[in-house]
Design a protein with these regions (language model features):
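Conserved beta-strand elements of beta-rich interaction domains across eukaryotes
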Residues: 74, 84-88, 149-152, 295-297, ...
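Conserved kinase catalytic-core helix
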Residues: 129-133, 306-334, 339, 348-349
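ATP-binding glycine-rich phosphate-binding loop
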Residues: 17-95
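Catalytic activation segment of kinase domains across protein kinase-like and atypical kinase folds
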Residues: 232-234, 242, 248, 253-255, ...
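Core residues of folded domains in eukaryotic genome-function proteins
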Residues: 65, 75-79, 138-143, 286-290, ...
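Helical subdomain adjoining the active site within ATP-dependent kinase catalytic cores
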Residues: 1-36, 42-44, 404-525
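The N-lobe alphaC helix and its flanking beta3-alphaC-beta4 segment of protein kinase-like domains
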Residues: 88-135
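Conserved structural core of kinase catalytic domains
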Residues: 90-101, 139-311, 382-389
Length: 525
């Protein structure tokens, strides 16, 4: 196992839950069972397995309305539901799965069954990670009140980031109104255009001749879960040079940016990157919904509304301690940690206490308790009490033909034709720093500032040769890698720069001998 990714035994249990009426959530046939549970629990002797799910400290008793539940402890709570399609939204839009309940060609049936039944399907992995982290002692993950697989009578997926590329696919235009409905922000009003490239909205029925080739990728067979033990050899400096050495790309290639200057269009694209403007709506599709506590806002929003460096540092310290705990107990890597995947709730606790190798840390909250969310791309292990070996779970998003393909190359999605790329415990903090740096320090790496996070973020994104995974060597305030190439570069090249447990020492200003006033979160003794 990668040395900084460890597991500790956890006391999770399975129990039978009553049927949930979830029509107000546009769900039918809701059940707490999903296939990942069979990897953890002995289920052979259980009747009506669909009625069994993970036992949580406080659970959904009934649905009050779209945003509220009544719990088994008698509380009426406002909640957030993260709902994820089990089948690939894009393959569903393309019509690859055929009509539900009807016979399918052998390859289609194989792909459909694999996605529905694999313990590594992204929707299941996200739900299991949420449940496991919720039942742990760490307060920095949302409380979960229930997980349900169900049929959604209506489900909407944000496709804004992919809209421009999708519009270049003939099947996308052809299938509007057939396999999905398309909704655009401002549709029906004047002046709506696509913010990236100013693309006009596609009109249903419009004759468009798109010179695009549809490529059918063979389904990846269901592999066995094996231990992730092999490290990827650190490449030479030439392997992460500024220029690509080959035009013959594959999913594992990494391309750095070699354009001469930062264009106005690029800046506009980045500023608009978080805008939501396009959604695909599906009917009667299988989903997993995770019912969790409602958070108040994101870390990104906090940075935009608060300029206090002491607060920023204390809140980032919470994130570092949370990740160190998750790596120590679940071998957990989030794999998509950015400013909007860290949220917060208000807290009355003035300080939080952590203990690492006998040292106690007293971190001020300033009224904010950070919560890390969204685990559909996670990799982690769960070891139940009494288990000899942990069970490893890896999101299906890491299949070579899926959205995170090329970041790792390990079981259960190992491609024997390409070098092995192991899990990287530095990934989360490096990705987090790269996502927030320009917003917090817009003048770039040469900015004059005494903000404690400035040098810390630069360290987390520095390669062994002293260059940055974020900035080009030219020092021109231009991103070195764009899009998913950044994810692959962090995984491949940053090995020791941002391991959470090793970064705890950077927060020695919080070391204390004061007796804890709240429960201490133990990271490692």
């Amino acid at each position: 196992m990668v040395k900084d990714l460890r597991t500790q035994a956890v006391d999770m249990k399975l129990h039978r839950l009553p049927k949930l009426q979830a029509a107000q959530w546009n769900l039918t046939h809701a059940q707490p069972f999903f296939p990942s549970l069979e990897q953890l629990f002995k289920t052979e002797t259980l009747a009506s397995m669909a009625d069994y799910g993970i036992k949580l400290p406080e659970e959904v008793e009934s649905v009050v309305d779209a945003t509220h539940i009544k719990t088994t402890k008698g509380q009426t709570l406002e909640v957030h539901r993260k709902t994820t399609m089990i089948l690939s939204p894009f393959k569903t839009m393309k019509g690859e799965y055929s009509a539900p309940g009807l016979p399918k060609p052998a390859e289609t049936a194989k792909s459909y069954s694999e996605q529905m039944q694999s313990p590594h399907t992204a929707a299941y992995v996200g739900a299991l990670a949420s449940s496991a982290l919720s039942t742990s002692e760490c307060p920095h993950f949302p409380r979960v009140y229930g997980v349900y697989a169900a049929m959604a009578t209506k489900h909407e997926v944000n496709i804004s980031d992919d809209y421009e590329e999708l519009c270049d696919r003939k099947w996308f235009v052809d299938n509007i109104g057939k396999t999905f409905e398309l909704r655009l922000r401002g549709e029906g009003g004047e002046g709506f255009t696509h913010t990236r490239g100013q693309r006009m909205a596609v009109q249903v029925g419009e004759d468009i001749d798109l010179d695009a080739e549809d490529v059918t990728v063979e389904a990846v067979p269901e592999p066995t879960v094996e231990d992730v033990v092999e490290e990827y050899e650190l490449p030479s400096d030439s392997e992460y040079s500024e220029e690509s050495e080959s035009d013959d790309e594959d999913v594992y290639d990494i391309l750095s940016c070699d354009c001469s200057e930062r264009s106005e269009d690029e800046e506009d694209d980045e500023s608009a990157g978080d805008d939501e403007f396009a959604w695909a709506t599906f009917t009667e599709v299988p989903v997993v919904t995770t019912v969790m506590e409602k958070c108040e806002g994101t870390f990104y929003e906090l940075m935009k509304t608060t300029d206090d460096a002491q607060k920023h540092t204390a809140w980032v310290a919470q994130i570092v301690f949370a990740l160190a705990y998750a790596q120590r107990n679940f071998g957990f890597i989030h794999n998509d940690l950015h400013g909007n995947n860290v949220m917060y709730v208000p807290t009355a606790e003035e300080f939080l206490f952590y203990r690492h190798h006998g040292v106690t840390y007293r971190v001020p909250t300033y009224g904010i308790l950070m919560k890390i969310i969204d685990f559909d791309r996670a990799t982690f292990s769960v070891k139940l009490t009494g288990m000899k070996e942990p069970r490893f779970f890896m999101s299906s998003q890491f299949k070579p033909d899926e959205e995170a393909g090329g970041q790792y190359n390990i079981e259960p999605f190992h491609d024997s034709k390409s070098p092995r790329i192991a899990l990287n415990p530095s990934f989360d903090l490096a990705r987090f720093a790269s996502s927030m740096f320009w917003d917090m320090f817009p003048e770039g790496p040469t900015q004059k500032t005494d903000h404690p996070l400035f040098e810390m973020f630069k360290h987390w994104t520095t390669l062994p040769d002293g260059s940055s995974v974020v900035f080009r060597k030219k020092g021109d305030n231009h991103d070195r890698y764009h899009g998913f190439d950044l994810y692959k570069a962090i995984t491949r090249y940053l090995k020791e720069s941002a391991v959470p447990r090793k970064e705890i020492s950077k927060f020695n200003q919080y070391v204390t001998t004061v007796s804890p006033t709240t429960k201490v979160l133990v990271i490692g003794e």
